[in-house]
């Protein structure tokens, strides 16, 4: 009777208080938007960045040199992608134990700021050119830049980017301006700079020359014309009195025509069209006749090679205007003339094209400088003088003044419209023209007189340096190589006010610029004291000293191309802070910087030092919306990073960045970020589980690794494999792979497998009779502790806020997780044989799980614990499964292994009773609610 009462009491008892359930105050709901600023404040208070510098002093240094964003406006999603990617790389390199300083910087000179400041003066009814002196204007530009530097600094810090924010580099700092001017002097002293009049890309809106890096291309519709030039003289009698036909997409250049070009090896024909004779390339005759609307016969009167046209002379269609227009137009042989389009004869205006300029120069034909800096022909020009902008569609239209005048004299044969790509200013978006103006250039193909690359050219030095740099992705090398091979000399002068001046004095008699180190030293000393404003307010005689008279020298009024500014950052940031000769390990920017910062930095460093300023270059793509479209406010598909941060937190943005294949263009939308948030929640919940599961864990509880059960050893094997793969991903900057590997390990190997199997041990292998738990439970928690230390570090470079939150939750007095180094993962944990064995076990477990699931849905079994499975396997698989408790691994009541040739897999509901504490269905449980042997043991029953 007493035994019966004891059994009844056992069954009736509530065993829940004896079961360990993971408990933690770590919130499931992240609340990142509120939590992250608190963590930022902690980092600021503890000066985490400086702690790292002190801790890593003497360690291997890794310099990721920051390409300067422009100090104008709030940050956009492209900025966020760039800065977060940089921070992930720097934090991961820091995790490897390296000293990774980060000096953020800003590009502060240039047109966008000038425009904004000009607007401010206009609102005050002031004319910038007449009412404001250069120094006053520059000071206002400086104030404007300071405002946006301060604004963007706070926005970048909110992304979690760690750096020397209190001491950034600015291209407008006095020391920076002095060093930029000093870099220019290196080029001038070695004879690499020259002044020349040649066609450069010119913005009539901004009234300045632009470099290739400042040019965007957009499709436009242009008026094209077929135009006849009368041939007045030739050694081929048939040609005299006939007409050479040219085709052009720029009618506005005709008023400056100086010659006609032919291809020496091209076949030409003179044809009779209704009594008039016209010269075309034979290969383009059919297309040309269609364009001018000729449908009848076209008898060939003469056929010959272009070389035979040498010495022929034509007259300008507007020759009756006299003067310039009455001068003869010679035929010139040009290798650039092809039969790809047009007529095979090209009109030459040396003011408005590189090929035109070079061919005419070779024949002593000079440009005429007919178009002013505002894009209008000079008022004294005999045709089109003082009329509208040459880029105006009205000027170039078929019914515009140029075409109308040419039609009136009978020279215009046809007009049409061509849809094609055309250069535009990347800032104003206005169409550009080629315009011949006096500019300052850095020569690419002139052998250097002295210095680091004496006897070599800048182009050959740069191309050699490209081969010595690591490019990520590899295609970046081909891209910049092609650009450097084909680019013209670098035009470094700008006709503006806000920038570093070209600190040269030109001899008024010889035209040579002064190369005197003493003069240069005085200039640089003044710049260090009062900035580049010194050039604009100086008594230049003080700079020249006693050796030279100001009346003999003209100070240059142009400023430097801003790309020379940013191209010099390796000098005034990297070398200035870390020692002369120091090179950055990495430059990282968008793919457009192959023609921008990567290239200007390469040319500047190669010209002054003979090598690239970087060891490796990594590029990322542009940000597009979820459908692959460019973001546009008018379309309404812009993602504002600040809004995302305020709603979801910076860690969501950081995880999105890491998840992308940023070597290509990347997509972002609300839907994309929603998917990122789902992935984040899974990782966060796994950390929450670890914190709860490790509650109360102590060193005394640890089990020697040699004594771990096989499953735990297998998990450590997977961890060792993961560790190696993550390390490789860091070194290859492959963070999308890094995040995928980390997420897959946590979600698939841990949450869905290891944690699932071992939750019974965690919950139920501890009690009053076993306060520290069984050996198996302690082994599990030992591995959980190893996993925690590894995973929180692995996550830290990407989820910098969440990793800190997790770490401090468990170790509130341990300092920042970002002060720790890469986890110590023993390579001996790798066990290929064990890995192969457990791959088989997991494969069979998956088969069992998939077979049970339909029965759970149909409520034939309530959970897998109620299932008995008959599993047919071959002998080799049976041996593997028999070596482990496969029922425990499948979380089932029982697994019966049978020969593979027998029946198919079956699942039945077990007849075993359910333990009242652990809920397992086991043979020793006498009836539902009674305890199994294990539970009796740990609770002391």
UniProtKB/Swiss-Prot annotation:
* Cofactor binding description: Binds 1 zinc ion per subunit.
UniProt binding sites for ATP: 633
* Motif position, 'KMSKS' region: 630-634
Catalytic activity reads:
tRNA(Ile) + L-isoleucine + ATP = L-isoleucyl-tRNA(Ile) + AMP + diphosphate
GO molecular function list: aminoacyl-tRNA deacylase activity; ATP binding; isoleucine-tRNA ligase activity; tRNA binding; zinc ion binding
Pfam families under this entry? Anticodon_1 (PF08264), tRNA-synt_1 (PF00133)
* Enzyme type, top EC level: ligase
Q: Where are the transmembrane segments?
A: none
What GO biological process term is on the record, naming one? isoleucyl-tRNA aminoacylation
Q: Where is this motif: 'HIGH' region?
A: 69-79
Positions binding L-isoleucyl-5'-AMP in this chain are 589
Q: Which cofactor does it need?
A: Zn(2+)
**InterPro entries per the record?**
aa-tRNA-synth_I_CS, aa-tRNA-synth_Ia, Anticodon_Ile_BEm, Ile-tRNA-ligase, Ile-tRNA-ligase_type1, Ile-tRNA_ligase, M/V/L/I-tRNA-synth_anticd-bd, Rossmann-like_a/b/a_fold
Q: Which CDD domains match?
A: Anticodon_Ia_Ile_BEm
User: Mind telling me which GO cellular component terms the entry cites?
Assistant: cytosol
Keywords from the UniProt entry? Aminoacyl-tRNA synthetase, ATP-binding, Cytoplasm, Ligase, Metal-binding, Nucleotide-binding, Protein biosynthesis, Zinc
Q: What is known of its domains?
A: IleRS has two distinct active sites: one for aminoacylation and one for editing. The misactivated valine is translocated from the active site to the editing site, which sterically excludes the correctly activated isoleucine. The single editing site contains two valyl binding pockets, one specific for each substrate (Val-AMP or Val-tRNA(Ile)).
**Family stated for the protein in its record:** Belongs to the class-I aminoacyl-tRNA synthetase family. IleS type 1 subfamily.
Subunit and partners: Monomer.
The protein's role, per its UniProt record: Catalyzes the attachment of isoleucine to tRNA(Ile). As IleRS can inadvertently accommodate and process structurally similar amino acids such as valine, to avoid such errors it has two additional distinct tRNA(Ile)-dependent editing activities. One activity is designated as 'pretransfer' editing and involves the hydrolysis of activated Val-AMP. The other activity is designated 'posttransfer' editing and involves deacylation of mischarged Val-tRNA(Ile).
NCBIfam families named among the record's database cross-references: ileS
Please state what the protein is called. Isoleucine--tRNA ligase
């Amino acid at each position: 009777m007493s035994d019966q009462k004891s059994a009844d009491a056992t069954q009736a008892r509530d065993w829940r208080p004896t079961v360990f359930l993971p408990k933690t105050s770590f919130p499931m709901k992240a609340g990142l938007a509120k939590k992250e600023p608190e963590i930022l404040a902690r980092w600021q208070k503890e000066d985490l960045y400086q702690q790292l510098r002190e801790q890593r002093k003497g360690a291997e240094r890794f310099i990721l040199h920051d390409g300067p964003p422009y100090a104008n406006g709030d940050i956009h999603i492209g900025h966020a992608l760039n800065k977060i990617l940089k921070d992930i790389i720097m934090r991961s390199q820091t995790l490897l134990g390296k000293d990774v300083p980060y000096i953020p910087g800003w590009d502060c000179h240039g047109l966008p700021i000038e425009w904004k400041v000009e607007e401010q003066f206009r609102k005050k009814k002031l004319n910038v050119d007449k009412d404001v002196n250069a120094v006053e204007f520059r000071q206002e530009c400086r104030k404007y830049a300071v405002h946006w530097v301060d604004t963007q600094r706070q926005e970048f810090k909110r992304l979690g980017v760690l750096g020397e924010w209190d001491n950034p580099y600015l291209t407008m700092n006095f020391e920076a301006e002095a060093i930029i001017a000093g870099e220019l002097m290196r080029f001038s002293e070695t004879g690499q700079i020259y002044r020349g009049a040649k066609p450069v890309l010119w913005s009539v809106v901004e009234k300045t020359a632009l470099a290739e890096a400042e040019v965007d291309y957009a499709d436009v519709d242009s008026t094209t014309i077929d135009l006849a030039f009368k041939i007045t003289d030739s050694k081929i009698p048939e040609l005299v009195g006939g007409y050479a036909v040219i085709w052009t997409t720029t009618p506005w250049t005709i008023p400056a025509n100086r010659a006609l070009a032919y291809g020496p090896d091209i076949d030409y024909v003179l044809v009779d069209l209704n009594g008039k004779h016209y010269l075309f390339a034979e290969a383009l005759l059919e297309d040309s006749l269609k364009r001018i609307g000729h449908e009848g016969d076209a008898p060939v009167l003469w056929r010959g090679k272009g070389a035979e046209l040498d010495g022929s002379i034509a007259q300008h269609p507007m020759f009756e205007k006299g003067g310039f227009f009455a001068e003869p137009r010679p035929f010139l042989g040009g290798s650039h003339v092809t039969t790809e389009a047009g007529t095979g004869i090209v009109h030459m205006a040396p003011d408005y094209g590189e090929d035109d300029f070079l061919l005419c120069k070779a024949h002593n034909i000079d440009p005429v400088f007919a178009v002013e800096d505002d894009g209008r022909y000079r008022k004294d020009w005999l045709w089109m003088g003082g009329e509208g902008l040459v880029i105006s569609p009205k000027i170039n239209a078929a019914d515009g003044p140029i075409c109308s005048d040419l039609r009136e004299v009978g020279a215009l044969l046809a007009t049409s419209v061509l849809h094609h790509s055309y250069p535009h200013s990347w800032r104003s978006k206005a169409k550009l023209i080629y315009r011949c103006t006096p500019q300052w250039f850095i020569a690419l193909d002139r052998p250097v007189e002295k210095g680091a690359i004496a006897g070599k050219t800048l182009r050959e030095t740069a191309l050699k340096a490209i081969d010595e740099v690591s490019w990520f992705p590899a295609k970046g090398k081909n891209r910049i190589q092609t650009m450097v091979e084909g680019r013209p000399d670098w035009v470094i002068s700008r006709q503006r006010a806000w920038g570093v001046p070209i600190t040269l004095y030109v001899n008024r008699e010889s035209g040579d610029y002064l190369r005197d180190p003493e003069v240069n030293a005085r200039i640089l000393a003044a710049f260090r004291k009062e900035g580049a404003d010194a050039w604009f307010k100086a008594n230049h005689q003080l700079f020249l000293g006693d050796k030279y008279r100001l009346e003999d020298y003209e100070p240059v009024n142009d400023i430097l191309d801003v790309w020379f500014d940013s191209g010099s950052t390796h000098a005034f940031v990297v070398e200035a802070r870390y020692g002369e000769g120091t090179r950055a390990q990495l430059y990282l920017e968008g793919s457009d910087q192959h023609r921008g910062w990567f290239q200007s930095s390469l040319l500047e460093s190669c010209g002054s030092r003979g090598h690239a300023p970087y060891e490796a270059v990594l590029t990322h793509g542009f940000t597009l919306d979820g459908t692959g479209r460019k973001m546009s406010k008018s379309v309404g598909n812009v993602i504002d990073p600040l809004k995302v941060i305020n709603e979801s937190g910076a860690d969501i943005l950081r995880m999105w960045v890491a998840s992308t294949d940023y070597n290509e263009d990347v997509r972002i939308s609300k839907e994309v970020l929603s998917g990122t948030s789902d992935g984040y929640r899974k990782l966060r919940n796994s950390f929450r589980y670890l914190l709860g599961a490790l509650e109360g864990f102590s060193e005394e509880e640890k089990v020697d690794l040699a004594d771990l059960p096989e499953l735990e050893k297998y998990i450590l094997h997977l961890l060792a494999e993961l560790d190696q793969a993550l390390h490789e991903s860091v070194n290859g900057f492959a963070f999308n792979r890094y995040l995928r590997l980390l997420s897959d390990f946590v979600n698939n190997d841990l949450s869905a497998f290891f944690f699932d199997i071992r939750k019974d041990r965690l919950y139920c292998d501890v009690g009053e009779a076993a306060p520290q738990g069984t050996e198996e439970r302690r082994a599990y928690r030992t591995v959980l502790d190893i996993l925690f230390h590894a995973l929180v570090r692995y996550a830290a470079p990407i989820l910098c806020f969440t990793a800190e939150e997790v770490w401090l939750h468990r170790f509130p007095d341990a300092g920042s997780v970002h002060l720790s180094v890469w986890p110590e993962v023993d390579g001996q944990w790798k066990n290929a044989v064990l890995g192969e064995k457990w791959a088989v076990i997991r494969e069979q477990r998956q088969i069992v799980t998939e077979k049970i699931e339909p029965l759970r849905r149909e409520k034939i079994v309530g959970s897998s614990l109620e299932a008995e499975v008959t599993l047919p396997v071959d002998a080799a698989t049976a041996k593997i499964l028999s070596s482990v408790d496969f029922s425990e691994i499948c979380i089932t009541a029982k697994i019966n292994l049978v020969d593979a040739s027998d029946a198919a897999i079956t699942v039945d509901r077990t007849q075993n009773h359910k333990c009242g504490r652990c809920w397992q269905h086991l043979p020793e449980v006498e009836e539902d609610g009674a305890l199994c042997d294990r539970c009796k043991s740990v609770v002391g029953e």
